[in-house]
Amino acid sequence: MDGIDRNPRQKLSLLLVAGRHHLSSRDLRELVEFLQNEDCGFDVSLQISDPTQQPELLELHRLVVTPSLVKLQPQPKQVFAGSSIFQQLRGWLPRWQQDEVVSGLGLSLKPTELDGSRTQRELQLEDQLLVLRQENETLIDRLQAQERLLRMVAHELRTPLTAATLAVQSQELGQIDIHRFRDVLKRRLEEIALLSKDLLEVGSTRWEALFNPQRLDLTSVAAEAILELEKLWLGRDVTIHTDIPADLPKVFADQRRMRQVLLNLLENALKYTPNGGLISLTMLHRTSQWVQVSISDSGPGIPEEEQQRIFLDRVRLPQTSAGASGFGVGLSVCRRIVEVHGGRIWVISEPEKGACFTFNVPIWQGQGQEKENVVLTEGQAEP
């Protein structure tokens, strides 16, 4: 009799549909640790699935955003999504435990008062209301994700349009020959065509579809970004200094999105650096996991109370005393891109001492990394 479990616990079968970068966020780390290590009253079985490797799960469970947590057993099935999965789960666990106790006694819940105040019908209505709230939160998350995608693509359109305009002006002034002009125009039109495709896909696809991480030479991407902005700094007394080691390892990142981050940070640095100022671009790899990129300027700096806000959506700081427009949606786009790659971005700044923006990118680890094809969706924790 000693080997018999007198109180066998019901199995709680959960499916977490999330990408690898989701699992590095604080909320999901806490969720997984809780389910694996804490006693929540159930025999927990947690399966973690990558939606890129198993896209059929999205249709099977009617998931519109990731990450999502699906309760498979005991029935009925429930889906938790949005930015508060862990909190939602903890709110439901006591209810499931109550259902387990009643079921274990061979009883069924009748439409009578259960606790002296609420009937079973009232509990059912409460459950339905919670489900509706979850679905509403999921839809809101999806709409917000699409809005951020639109802002990202619209912001990125500025670069090829500006470059094409400058090329036309330079050709009219005789500063570049017709062959150079055609080459620049052709490349910029190709970029605009790709961005137009992105815009068409925003309403029908998820965030991850706009990213394609691969083995990437970040040094070359940085050189191209500096060359692309040369028209902005050649006519000014501004020095651009680069410090990139020759043995810098390749990274695992999307080429277009890394270029977008570098262009945005360099453009901001040029905007805020006065004549006679210095801009520095440095890259280093202190660990075997990350390449760290820093872009610093000698501008007016950013007030300490604004240094976190500038990375948020819908935040634009006031104009500086020099008349430059405030930081806009570009930095929030940079944050999203960096986080989607599993990294983080931050700024160190003091008034009148310039600003230094730093972000990290994962180092290329070999063919196995590419086969895993990191799930690039939304939901990273705030840096």
From Swiss-Prot:
GO terms for biological process: circadian rhythm. Its EC number is 2.7.13.3. SUPFAM superfamilies: ATPase domain of HSP90 chaperone/DNA topoisomerase II/histidine kinase (SSF55874), Homodimeric domain of signal transducing histidine kinase (SSF47384), Thioredoxin-like (SSF52833). InterPro entries: HATPase_C_sf (IPR036890), His_kinase_dom (IPR005467), HisK_dim/P_dom (IPR003661), HisK_dim/P_sf (IPR036097), KaiB_domain (IPR011649), Kinase_SasA (IPR023527), Sig_transdc_His_kin-like_C (IPR004358), Thioredoxin-like_sf (IPR036249). It comes from the Bacteria. The N-terminus interacts with KaiC, while the C-terminal histidine kinase domain autophosphorylates and is probably responsible for self-oligomerization. The N-terminal domain stimulates the C-terminus to autophosphorylate. Homooligomerizes. Interacts with KaiC. Participates in the KaiABC clock complex, whose core is composed of a KaiC homohexamer, 6 KaiB and up to 6 KaiA dimers. SasA and KaiB(fs) compete to bind to KaiC. This is Adaptive-response sensory kinase SasA. It comes from Synechococcus sp. (strain CC9311).
